């Protein structure tokens, strides 16, 4: 485990890897990193606390010893630290929520630097606001900004992909209704950041409505 401030470039940086969800993202990323055919050859983790990141790396590596991953210090409230991250990777995976409170500076830094961005957000207002604010800059810089790469969206996306492959020829459905069922031997619980995101989303639903009314309507798919 290497705590560092400056240095090389990485295929992927996971921001917020010590958080509740970030630890699981890190655990899955380590599986890809250890696969010979994986395109991921170098990973770094970033956040406010090197100590917590070190603990997260140890947890995510169990039962194996933790690999020697660079640990970078960054804070969503510090734009210069975010710019530093973007300069060191082609892909930043953001796990710091609630995104309405912490996500906008990260998207802004990626869009300006031409760094590709992924997150696990399920917050419509955040996603639509950053699209409105940074779409043109991201296009000019060649940055892909992709939100909702988490449980809120991925199961439904996989279901739609599976459904679409069942149709033959030019036939295609114009609507898909998806249902998700969960099975687990353990009790299903949520974490505080997820709860906070939901509460803030409901409390500020009127702001999302105002945003949508202020934006030009997109044409419906034909």
Predicted regions and their residues:
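Conserved beta-strand positions in the Rossmann-like core of class I SAM-dependent methyltransferases
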Residues: 41-45
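N-terminal Rossmann NAD(P)H-binding glycine-rich loop of SDR-like oxidoreductase domains
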Residues: 7-34
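Eukaryotic N-terminal low-complexity, Ser/Thr- and Lys/Arg-rich leader segments
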Residues: 1-9, 36-38, 62-64
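Rossmann-fold NAD(P)-binding glycine/threonine-rich loop
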Residues: 103, 121-143
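Conserved Rossmann-fold cofactor-binding substructure of NAD(P)-dependent oxidoreductases
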Residues: 70-102
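ADP-ribose/adenylate-binding Rossmann-like module
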Residues: 98, 107-127
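Active-site-lining helix/loop region of Rossmann-like oxidoreductase modules
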Residues: 165-222
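N-terminal Rossmann-fold cofactor-binding loop
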Residues: 46-50, 75-76
């Amino acid at each position: 485990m290497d705590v560092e401030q400056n240095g090389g470039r990485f295929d992927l940086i996971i921001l917020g890897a010590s958080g509740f969800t970030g630890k699981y993202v890190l655990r899955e990323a380590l599986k890809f990193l250890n696969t010979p055919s994986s395109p991921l050859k170098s990973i770094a983790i970033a956040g406010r606390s090197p100590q917590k990141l070190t603990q997260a790396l140890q947890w995510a590596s169990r039962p194996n010893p933790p690999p020697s991953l660079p640990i970078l210090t960054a804070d969503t409230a510090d734009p210069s630290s975010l710019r530093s991250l973007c300069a060191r990777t082609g892909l930043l995976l953001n796990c710091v929520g609630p995104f309405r409170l912490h996500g906008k500076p990260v998207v802004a830094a990626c869009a300006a630097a031409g760094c590709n961005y992924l997150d696990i957000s399920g917050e419509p207002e955040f996603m639509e606001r950053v699209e409105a604010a940074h779409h043109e800059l991201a296009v000019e810089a060649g940055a892909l900004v992709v939100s909702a790469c988490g449980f809120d969206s991925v199961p439904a996306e996989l279901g739609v992909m599976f459904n679409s492959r069942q149709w033959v020829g030019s036939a295609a459905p114009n609507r898909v209704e998806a249902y998700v069922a969960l099975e687990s031997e353990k009790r299903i619980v949520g974490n505080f950041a997820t709860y906070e995101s939901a509460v803030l989303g409901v409390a500020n639903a009127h702001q999302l409505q105002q945003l949508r009314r202020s934006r030009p309507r997109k044409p419906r798919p034909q």
